[in-house]
Amino acid sequence: MLRYVARRLLQMVPVFFGATLLIYAMVFALPGDPIAALGGQRSLSPEVIDQIKASYHLDKPFIVQYLLYLKGLFTLDLGQSLRGTESVLDVLVRAYPITIKLSLMALAFEAIAGIGFGLIAGVRKGGWFDATVLVLSLVVIAVPTFVIGFVLQFIIGVRLGWLPVTAGESPGFTELLMPAMVLGAVSFAYVLRLTRTEVAENLTADHVRTARAKGLSGVRVMIVHVLRNSLVPVVTFLGADLGALMGGAIVTEGIFNIKGVGGTLYSAIIRGDGPMVVSFTTVLVLVFIVSNLLVDLLYAALDPRIRYA
């Protein structure tokens, strides 16, 4: 196992450098001149533009800019934002903890609720509960996220008053609970349907019939032989979904006025703030890489047939 982890860590190195190079190249190739646009209605003089470009190393060749960016990344010196006095690192440190907390809560919601409802639906395949949750999951998948957000805001926040309608500057568990449900709603539906299909299929498998013939209790058969095997594809989906949740929280953060990664990254893209865009997306790449590694390590725990040399 240790050799496998070491090998995967070595494989992550070229993936990381390749992804960051691609991101930097895409930002470098964006049309327009964000430096010239800093003056707004008034045009900046060529001398001022050259001075600003020199301060951001924009006067150097692309590969030199990229190497300087990597140097700053490894020394935690990400430079200044093009459209503000704050450093990129300060903005990143302020925004990422909020989105990480929101994404983990959304992941927990879709995992607990999706696996729970999917397990019941798979065991009772063809019954009224199975039909009901399948229809509801299709509705959740079909309805846009912002509609789900506004509906929950009105029902849970306004009519019932159970949860806050919006989040503050430093949102806690209560303020993030409803946004987490909205963010994880679509993934919850997919986890439910995936779990339901896997459980229903494993219930008719030969190894399950053999376990029952040996006299094992129903609970042991369900947990060890059915649920454990059914969770392998579910864990794959959840692991890949963590990065997608963090990168796709723009709509949810906008609905609930959350100052996280989504809104900050969207604003940086609109403004052409290259240092901000590159730094934020680089962290997202790291999240994807690490989450995929953790998923691979969980396989061996869930499926005894999987062994890493």
Name each model-derived stretch.
Residues M12, R42-S43, L138, F154, ...:
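Residue-level recognition of pore/gate-forming positions within transmembrane alpha-helices
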Residues M26-L30, L38, R42, L73-F74, ...:
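Hydrophobic aliphatic residues
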Residues V15-L67, L160-M178:
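Hydrophobic alpha-helical transmembrane segments of membrane transport/permease proteins
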Residues A19, I23, V27, G149, ...:
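Juxtamembrane/transmembrane-helix interface segments of polytopic membrane transporters
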Residues L22-A29, H57, K71-G72, V135-P164, ...:
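Membrane-water interface segments at the C-terminal ends of transmembrane alpha-helices
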Residues L2-Y4, D90-F129, T145, E169-A309:
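Alpha-helical transmembrane segments of integral membrane proteins
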Residues D59-I115:
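An internal, D/E-rich "acidic patch" concept
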